[in-house]
A protein has these predicted regions:
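Conserved ABC transporter NBD signature motif
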Residues: 68-80
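ABC ATPase nucleotide-binding domain
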Residues: 11, 35, 71, 352-354
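Non-catalytic connector elements of ABC transporters
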Residues: 253, 263-363
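Conserved coupling/switch loops of ABC nucleotide-binding domains, chiefly the family-specific signature
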Residues: 66-69, 225
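ABC ATPase nucleotide-binding domains
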Residues: 92-94, 98, 102-245
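Helix-to-loop junction immediately C-terminal to a conserved catalytic motif
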Residues: 60
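The feature captures the beta-strand-to-loop junction immediately N-terminal to the Walker
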Residues: 45-47
Length: 363
């Protein structure tokens, strides 16, 4: 056990947390266990109400669990059995709030220096540490400005600088990009990943955006109703989901109304509105009328007949900038439609939509 704690910057074991007490208690976390290794970024991903922000706040010391343990390095900061809980201000964690929570009447320098002053460091040391972290985040020339004089992206960097300035073992990020517009979000996502790699940070990040989680993190914990649904690398979560919930949350999919007509190992023979297709069974099993999905980008468009395909008329194409998203569907709505991507705008007509068996998942 001691070896695991040394390897891990953060260890959470069997954490339970309720809102309310007694008969009105609402379980939010239901036995969550996770770890964060040195230099690793873990994203807590999930829909609203899944428990991801509550887990982050429990680690920070801003929520009180009822059961389980939390350790930062070798130091226990919460133990439900011993009724021990270390106050948030003594956990030495860097926290970046969703709203950034900058003091409007303090300069950038003063905002970043605030935590160091609370720790009663000397003025010269504070000046050096703040100057160093501002330089690292590209804010060296903005030290005397106030928050209202900064862009959204610059405000975010100040919040990160404030969290990093006292060199915490773990930085906690609560929806760090959600307050930025689409263009700034893309730029900030790249900056945040570059900063994490360059400084070797250990970070736990909350997000509801799967693209953001995949781009920034080394590992994803997908939460569903207070439990970890699945965890793994971004690539494994996207390409080999264990459950329907994971498959649907991690990508853009087509759903097909299919009936199982036969099986051969993990290969499943399907009837989809008269078309005979082969798919791949995923998860613990599937019934006679399972949920069958395929990622939109895995659908191959052909003007001529191909194997494992459905023939449908083109209804419309939508221009997305780098590609077209095409919808194939009978105009009368008699069958479910399929979406597929194309580099070019397609001419009206009927097309064969090939659904590769290994990418047609049956749950």
């Amino acid at each position: 056990m001691k070896r695991d704690l040394i390897m891990n910057e953060l260890t959470v074991n069997d954490l339970h947390l309720d809102y309310g007490t007694g008969a009105t208690a609402n379980p939010i976390l239901k036995g969550v266990s996770m770890h964060l290794q040195k230099g690793e970024v873990v994203a807590l991903l999930g829909p609203s109400g899944s428990g991801k922000t509550t887990l982050l706040r429990a680690v920070a010391g801003l929520e009180s669990p009822k059961q389980g343990t939390i350790a930062i390095g070798e130091r226990q900061v919460f133990d439900g059995a011993r009724k021990f809980e270390l106050a948030a201000e003594h956990r030495n964690l860097g926290l970046v709030f969703q709203s950034y929570a900058l003091w409007p009447h303090k300069t950038v320098f003063e905002n970043v220096a605030y935590g160091l002053k609370l720790r009663k460091l000397g003025a010269a040391e504070i000046k050096d540490k703040v100057a160093d972290v501002l330089k690292n985040l590209g804010l060296g020339h903005l030290g005397e400005r106030y928050p209202h004089q900064l862009s959204g992206g610059q405000q975010q960097r100040v919040a990160i600088a404030r969290a990093l300035v006292y060199n915490p073992p773990v930085i906690l990020l609560d929806e760090p990009l959600s307050n930025l517009d689409a263009k700034l979000r893309e730029e900030a996502r790249a900056f945040l990943r570059e900063l994490i790699v360059r400084l070797g940070l250990s970070a736990l990040m909350v997000t509801h955006d799967q693209a953001e989680a995949m781009a920034i993190s080394d590992r994803i914990l997908l939460l569903n109703n207070g439990k970890i649904e699945q965890q793994g690398t971004p690539q494994s979560m996207y390409e080999t989901p264990d459950t329907l919930f994971t498959a649907e949350f991690m990508g853009s999919n087509n759903r097909l109304a299919a009936k199982v007509v036969g099986r051969d190992g993990d290969r499943v023979r399907l009837d989809v509105h008269g078309a005979q297709l082969t798919g791949t069974a995923r998860g613990p099993g599937s019934g006679a009328e399972p949920t069958t999905i395929i990622r939109v980008e895995e659908v191959k468009i052909s003007a001529t007949p191909v194997d494992n395909a459905i023939e449908l008329p083109l209804l419309t194409c939508m221009y997305l900038g780098d590609r077209f998203e095409c919808l194939f569907k009978h105009a009368d709505g008699s069958e479910a439609g399929l979406r597929a991507y194309s580099k070019y705008k397609l001419e009206p007509g009927r097309y064969w939509l090939q659904l590769p068996a290994e990418k047609l998942w049956v749950f």
